Amino acid sequence: MDLTAMLGASFVGAFLYAFTTLLPVINPFSGAMFFVTLTGHLSDADRSYVAGRIALFSLIILMVCLFAGHIILGFFGISVGVLRCAGGIVLFAAGWNALNAPAQDGTSSPKMELPRSRLKAMAFYPFTLPLTTGPGAIAVTVAIGTTLPYNFSNLAGTILAILAVVAVIWLCFRYGDR
């Protein structure tokens, strides 16, 4: 087997490994339901803006976790268990609010326009962290970063997989209300 074939196999293997590991953990399909429920009061333009910001923030978080996640968590003394607990509490609260929301009579409520600074803050917390790229995604990304050998094809495959997952996040959140 020549070097090109080995690098190609390594690239594809790293892509498939990272993509199939991250996608079910992040689960943007169910995350889109929370997103639509919690942003129902926003205009379509604001919801689109928040979805784009969530994708961007998710990309940044996943890349930082890939390259430096284990160092950062150790530096601050944060365990994955603490992140997992906080993420669970936020998910529980969001689910509880969705279950106890007042019944809608079919008429649409007036849409609100919020300042961009408020939308950015909303996009980061709680949507990006911990709902989208929460403790599970952080732990998995740190594990991927420490498991795969550092070579160009593995790194390229993993980065492309993260980009693909972020694209799925954006698509699900952007068009989740349709």
Set out the residue ranges of the language-model regions.
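Small-residue-enriched transmembrane helix starts and helix-helix packing motifs
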Residues: 1-24, 101, 108-128
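Juxtamembrane transmembrane-helix termini in multi-pass membrane transport proteins
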Residues: 14-64
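Transmembrane alpha-helical segments of integral membrane proteins
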Residues: 34-36, 166-178
